[in-house]
Design a protein with these regions (language model features):
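Sec-dependent N-terminal signal peptides
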Residues: 4-13
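C-terminal and inter-domain tail/linker signature
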Residues: 16-174
Length: 174
């Protein structure tokens, strides 16, 4: 019985071994996303476009992708409706770390090729130009990289209710 338990333990331990997933924080892709976010904060749409593949698929809380033109229009509307816009990360009362960014490279598994994704977490803080109300949205954005070093898929996950309400106010005032 002891030998059987030992065999099961060794088998379990071996099955939990490293599967070649690599997580980095200060790599080329993570740093490119930090620059990408600075371009967003500076309302530099041309700078943002430099990192996007022309065929990028952008998903905003949905499995249905929106067009790059629609996405750029939304980003421009954010800057028209809010000032300032900040991206922060950290414990309340602690040091602001900016945006938390990490890149994960997954090995090929079965029919799936290897892939590299950069994940980011932050609080999107913005003050509405019309209402003067400051909103804080916890956000997660994931970026999938193509072989050419461009972003081919972008996944946005956050509650947009307050943001969209403020943008609607902005449009009513026009």
């Amino acid at each position: 019985m002891k030998k059987l338990l030992l065999l099961l333990f060794v088998g379990f331990t071996m099955s939990c071994s490293n599967n070649d997933v690599v997580v980095t924080f200060d790599d080329e892709n993570s740093n490119a996303i930090r620059t990408h976010f600075q371009n967003y904060l500076n309302n530099d749409m041309d700078g943002l476009k430099e990192l996007w593949s022309p065929d990028i698929k952008v998903y905003l809380n949905s499995k249905q992708a929106i067009s790059l033109d629609d996405f750029v229009g939304l980003l421009e509307a954010q800057h028209a409706g809010f000032d300032p816009i900040l991206m922060t990360f950290g414990e309340e009362g602690g040091e602001d770390l900016g945006v938390w960014v990490q890149t994960i490279t997954y090995p090929a598994i079965g029919e799936y090729p290897s892939s590299t994704l950069t994940q980011s977490w932050f609080d999107w803080n913005a003050t509405g130009k019309v209402s003067g109300k400051t909103i804080v949205l916890p956000a997660h954005i994931g970026f999938k990289w193509g072989e050419d070093g461009k972003i081919i898929e972008e996944y946005h996950n956050y509650d947009t209710q307050e943001m969209m309400a403020e943008l609607a106010l902005s449009q009513e005032m026009e």
